[in-house]
């Protein structure tokens, strides 16, 4: 019989373009799922990989700032065409992150429900709440042999637009103005 829990501890793991320091990974088989937990200087969270149904990621904090090496094409040659992405085998995922830092930017609370519907990936309950401003969104990304299209619809909301802009390192002339902006974007 195989063990129900497996744990790995390492001083550093290079994965996803980033070094994860003082990392402890564990996987535990539970009824109807496997729970993978990660704890390091850069992440503290768990992923519940359900046998059936959506996966669920509960993250207390994440600092993800990948450093990928740039690949240069030969002089005068065009860059290679982008690879097609297929959503068919992607799992549906519920993401809940209490404190997320991505590419050096503190995004704060991040939530998303991603669902796979064949050649379409949908976003419901998309949320980024920095504490200075809030974005909620729904979206759709469709890709198949006949078409490629994307849409994102949502709302930006905050009490003081200058504080929200300053949070992202931008200075604007408007001061102290509340904002409530709806957006509806489509592209192919």
What residue ranges belong to the model's regions?
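A short glycine-rich beta-turn/N-cap micro-motif
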Residues: 32-33
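Small-residue helix/turn framework positions
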Residues: 3-14, 39-78, 85-101, 106, ...
